Amino acid sequence: FYHISTDEVYGALELTRPEGDAAGGESGGGPFGEEFFTEETKYAPHSPYSASKASSDHFVRAYHDTYGMPTLVTNCSNNYGPYQFPEKLIPLFINNIRHRRPLPVYGRGQNVRDWLYVEDHARAIDVIFHRGKVADTYNIGGFNEWKNIDLIRVIVRTVDRLLGNPEGASEKLITYVTDRAGHDMRYAIDSRKLKRELGWQPSLQFEEGIEKTVRWYLENQSWMDDITSGEYQQY
């Protein structure tokens, strides 16, 4: 039994490098702190959502311990890529830019997330399912941290360029809104165990992945429109 979970079960990490690591790029990609979530990090969920995910992890392990069911648990960072439901940040903002709608940013956009291209996540699932150690846990991350506001600006620049808009034309759509309750400051996964034991590592640089993602949504606008209009529910 393969159980896919989230890094949110671990709680939150401190933002000890507010500007990130210069080696990671001008505004993203490098670590924003010294600590990372490992497979040994204690669970400390801060929201009902993450608490429910943590409980599901424990249920899976309990079934292995009690009944001997072969299990695997993975905890991954934020995914992005094609076919993501448009309530999620990246497809939502691509669609909002296309329709000239506001781009809502929680707080001041300083929260940090690690981003993983969905095809890299799928490759990790495949290798863990076939070669992972039964009853073990593996973290899957992109080693690719971005502040929300910096990520949004990358999306804005990419969409504007591909649509032929003047540079920075959609920056004015950024709208700061009240921060979300229980909004953890930083998530960052250490997936070196997965690389060391099973040889997996991300294949795409973020710049390539976000370019592919934006292009996909712009080239598949009918799919997005079908979802956002609710027409898909009539199937």
Language-model features: locations:
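Short, glycine/charged-enriched secondary-structure capping and boundary segments
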Residues: L15-E19, G30-F37, H64, P86-I94, ...
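C-terminal substrate-binding subdomain of Rossmann-fold SDR/epimerase-dehydratase oxidoreductases
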Residues: P91, I97-Y235
